[in-house]
Amino acid sequence: MKKTIIILLLYFLNLSSAYSIEPDVFVQSTVNRASEILSKDISKEEKINQLKVIAKETVDIRGVGFYSIGSARKNLNEDQKNKYLEVFEDYFLKSFSSRLSEYSNPKIDVQDKDVLNKNYTIVRSILVATPDRPEIKIDWRIYTKNPDNPLI
């Protein structure tokens, strides 16, 4: 009986890792979702709201916020940290979504990935050039500590 339980446990652990999403697939899926929203015939306000949803699901806003504040974080008490994170999230989502909503049907192609360690992978992509803008290289730092829920 003990052997059966161990075998089942190992099977399910292996099965769960089989369903984890690869960082390059995660990035391509995320940019495809954003591109779909940007190509819809909806108001700019609705595009912004839908882009904010994607950002909340895929970006480690808390991590970006603490990275942005740097060592000053050590001088804040818990209430100040919470207030800062609240203000930073509002700023980040507003800035991110309003700037991105200016693009009309952007095409981003994932090129390759570089696994830095078990927690981070760099995914390289390009924003395809149009007559109005040059090609832009974009590197995404993907936090992969939880492979079932990678974050930008």
Language model segments and positions:
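A broad, structure-centric signal for solvent-exposed, well-ordered loop/edge residues
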Residues: I7-L8, E45, V115-Y120, P134, ...
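Surface-exposed, charged secondary-structure patches
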Residues: K94-D139
